[in-house]
Amino acid sequence: MNNKWNYQPPSQEQTEKAKALAKETGISPVLCKLLLERGISSAAEAKRFFRPQLMELHDPFLMKDMDIAVDRLNEAMGRKERILVYGDYDVDGTTAVALVYKFLQQFYSNIDYYIPNRYEEGYGVSVKGVDYAYETGVKLIIVLDCGIKAVKEIAYAKEKGIDFIICDHHVPDDVLPPAVAILNAKRPDATYPYEHLSGCGVGFKFMQAFAINNGIEFHQLTPLLDLVAVSVASDIVPIMGENRILTYHGLKQINSNPSVGLRAIIDVCGLSDKEITVGDIVFKIGPRINASGRIQNGKEAVELLVEKDFSTALEKANQINQYNETRKDLDKTMTEEANKIVEQLEDLSERRTIVIFNEEWHKGVIGIVASRLTEIYYRPAVVLTRTNDLATGSARSVSGFDVYKAIEHCRDLLENFGGHTYAAGLSMKAENVEEFTRRFEEYVTNHILPEQTSAVIDIDAEIDFRDITPRFYQDLKRFNPFGPDNHKPIFCTHNVYDYGTSKVVGREQEHIKLELVDNKSNNVMNGIAFGQSSQVRYIKTKRSFDICYTIEENTHKRGEVQLQIEDIKPSEELN
């Protein structure tokens, strides 16, 4: 009940356009309004949106340096040089390494992969990693999901006779590393028409270009799309444009013929009998892959993702699942400790940010804790721990606010930083934490907008229960895969009542199972409100209330639709 609801009724012009598109497509005007908001204004565009085609992927050679990268890779193979595939320890990095390694290994055997240890080497290209490459005779490193800021490390590698091809999607600094080729659609002189690829997505485009250059049929790349889909979903990049095509077909691959490693993870997650969605990747598959790098070493995730024997893969997946259980325990403990620290801040009510530092916290979980604090207190949060004599941590942000720019403003206090709009990593000398806290707070206070300081639920449409027909739900499902820039629509219905059977459920009695009647149409719908058991007293008063919700398939009763309640508020009308 504390959330602000934001709904902008459609203008007369928008309503007319939605009706016209509905007439052309046969789709509900409510859903046509959502299509128009996504830039889709004709039946032909709707068809391309609902059925993305792999033939619509951009030419990979439109990316700057792609021709150079392919030539250098071909040269390395021709000379029989040792190649090292190097990547970050998160989901995007490990899937990227697995993808490039698996594909190239079909044509070339003198190849290895490397994932830096989060605790010994930190994020990105490390001197230790370069030394490993040199000692093992590597002449070419393909670095994925990192490297765009590794100016010193790549210069060091160059001195040792090692070339780099960078495949990254992070924002670069003014000075680019001295790599042979830099594949990054965010570089200032970028020529590629889509800038939101994941790190694994950039790796896929590199392999696509390599395949084209060497006469390899595209169908040999399609089995790798499952890894791209996992990376896109887990890295929370926009799922429109080229990412929508890649994710749509990646999910088809996951649900028809996933790689052995992914099949093992799906089995361990208990998802073998259901259709895998972006949500399953974000909340179940991705966290398990991530747990390897958080708790142990990301290399174990790559070992699983490239494994060919299912029984061996299942053993590895179970081990990674254990890491995830450890991660959850650490998450719970550290979040509780962090909450206590935050609640003791004297000026908490006046602050726009949270910055906390605990030398004993586990480095692999601080990003999750930062996310929890952002959710609880709804403000940008930075959580720091001590690693190798530095205060190292993660930042998370609220909707609409660019935390990367806020951190960049304090760059003179930092040893290293990088990331995106809503998530970033950083490190600094411990003596700089106090000044960083002050400057970070100052920047955010001066730049955050009033509407970004409280949780807002953006409502896409107001509907009645009678609008939720089987055809409506089937058309809504065609908007999948959902994600940033194509979020799952949130609907609102006014003046609903408890039908009499709503009750609190859950192991800790934290959820509400609802049966609701719409006062306007008298239609009845089932729903579930997760974590909202405190609302049940109001619901049982027999007074009307408004709900906002997404429409889901009931996982316990296949074919039955239910409402997943996001929030509940008393109706404004008198009862």
Give the ranges of each region predicted by the language model.
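Short gly/pro/ser/thr-enriched loop/turn and capping motifs at secondary-structure boundaries
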Residues: 119-121, 150, 170-175, 189-191, ...
